[in-house]
């Protein structure tokens, strides 16, 4: 701070004008400096903002270019291959191919062993069920059905404690089976399938009862359901209808009247059915010629031929016989048309 001295050496009072001028000069310089600095700062800020903005624009342009390139690549890929959804498939290498082959071979071996075991089990089951044939092999489903029926029949026997008759047992076995399997079961059990089929058993039973009632044991006029009754006298039904009983005759007793017929009889003249024969796996029933058909000839139509050949009587056992006087016999031309038709039918039955 400057002090002014006078001539006499006294300090004069400070003049306010100089100080104010100095302050003003200093303040004006400071303001100019500040303005310059602020201007420089403003310029720097403007430059930084411009640079940042330009950088963002450049980045956006670069990203846009990249997206366009990606879109173009995707379009090209879409044009070449269809777009696949889901996880991407891995590339097949040699190691993966080998692993796939080994895995497939193991799976095939497991399936083959499983089928072999199943076939062996079915073969052993076929030997247990009552329908075993070396020539004819049951299918898998038929084997299982027959085994189910067999188990059910055995369980019913154990539950009731009584042994059923053969016909009902076979009906239980053949329930739900096909006709070839039913025939095979009947053949193995020595039965005729027509005797135990549900739809035919009632008809057969009624037919048997009608036939047994029309054939009494005593002498009777010769009658047959399918042939006219010739006036040739009387014959004994025990001789005409005598057949060889089979091992399954006891199973067919419900179809016959035990009070009137003591042996297995047949209502028709076709002869008894023999046990089924297996020809290439197919069981068939054939008619057996009766003993009277094999050993005797029916000679009531032509007694003159019997006398000339010297044959003995028709039946050797006692009982009413067919005795016709020779004098009353007319020639063959003298018979009526009805008698000729009837004799032809009888001749065909006893001589075929």
From Swiss-Prot:
<feature type="modified residue" description="Phosphoserine">
    <location>
        <position position="274"/>
    </location>
</feature>
<comment type="function">
    <text>Acts as a transcriptional activator. Plays a role as a differentiation factor during neurogenesis. Required for the conversion of cells within the neural plate and ventral ectoderm into differentiated neurons. Promotes the differentiation of late-born retinal amacrine cells, but not early-born retinal ganglion cells. Its function is inhibited at early stages of retinal cells differentiation.</text>
</comment>
<dbReference type="GO" id="GO:0046982">
    <property type="term" value="F:protein heterodimerization activity"/>
</dbReference>
<keyword id="KW-0963">Cytoplasm</keyword>
<dbReference type="GO" id="GO:0005634">
    <property type="term" value="C:nucleus"/>
</dbReference>
<keyword id="KW-0539">Nucleus</keyword>
<comment type="subunit">
    <text>Efficient DNA binding requires dimerization with another bHLH protein. Forms a heterodimer with the bHLH protein hes2, and weakly interacts with hey1/hrt1.</text>
</comment>
<dbReference type="GO" id="GO:0007423">
    <property type="term" value="P:sensory organ development"/>
</dbReference>
<keyword id="KW-0524">Neurogenesis</keyword>
<feature type="modified residue" description="Phosphoserine">
    <location>
        <position position="258"/>
    </location>
</feature>
<feature type="domain" description="bHLH">
    <location>
        <begin position="102"/>
        <end position="154"/>
    </location>
</feature>
<feature type="compositionally biased region" description="Acidic residues">
    <location>
        <begin position="57"/>
        <end position="79"/>
    </location>
</feature>
<dbReference type="GO" id="GO:0045944">
    <property type="term" value="P:positive regulation of transcription by RNA polymerase II"/>
</dbReference>
<dbReference type="GO" id="GO:0070888">
    <property type="term" value="F:E-box binding"/>
</dbReference>
<keyword id="KW-0804">Transcription</keyword>
<dbReference type="Pfam" id="PF00010">
    <property type="entry name" value="HLH"/>
</dbReference>
<keyword id="KW-0221">Differentiation</keyword>
<dbReference type="GO" id="GO:0000981">
    <property type="term" value="F:DNA-binding transcription factor activity, RNA polymerase II-specific"/>
</dbReference>
<feature type="compositionally biased region" description="Basic residues">
    <location>
        <begin position="82"/>
        <end position="94"/>
    </location>
</feature>
<protein>
    <recommendedName>
        <fullName>Neurogenic differentiation factor 1</fullName>
    </recommendedName>
</protein>
<dbReference type="InterPro" id="IPR022575">
    <property type="entry name" value="NeuroD_DUF"/>
</dbReference>
<dbReference type="InterPro" id="IPR050359">
    <property type="entry name" value="bHLH_transcription_factors"/>
</dbReference>
<feature type="short sequence motif" description="Nuclear localization signal">
    <location>
        <begin position="88"/>
        <end position="94"/>
    </location>
</feature>
<dbReference type="GO" id="GO:0005737">
    <property type="term" value="C:cytoplasm"/>
</dbReference>
<keyword id="KW-0805">Transcription regulation</keyword>
<dbReference type="Pfam" id="PF12533">
    <property type="entry name" value="Neuro_bHLH"/>
</dbReference>
<feature type="region of interest" description="Disordered">
    <location>
        <begin position="1"/>
        <end position="96"/>
    </location>
</feature>
<keyword id="KW-0597">Phosphoprotein</keyword>
<keyword id="KW-0010">Activator</keyword>
<feature type="modified residue" description="Phosphoserine">
    <location>
        <position position="266"/>
    </location>
</feature>
<dbReference type="InterPro" id="IPR016637">
    <property type="entry name" value="TF_bHLH_NeuroD"/>
</dbReference>
<keyword id="KW-0238">DNA-binding</keyword>
<dbReference type="InterPro" id="IPR036638">
    <property type="entry name" value="HLH_DNA-bd_sf"/>
</dbReference>
<keyword id="KW-0217">Developmental protein</keyword>
<dbReference type="GO" id="GO:0061564">
    <property type="term" value="P:axon development"/>
</dbReference>
<dbReference type="InterPro" id="IPR011598">
    <property type="entry name" value="bHLH_dom"/>
</dbReference>
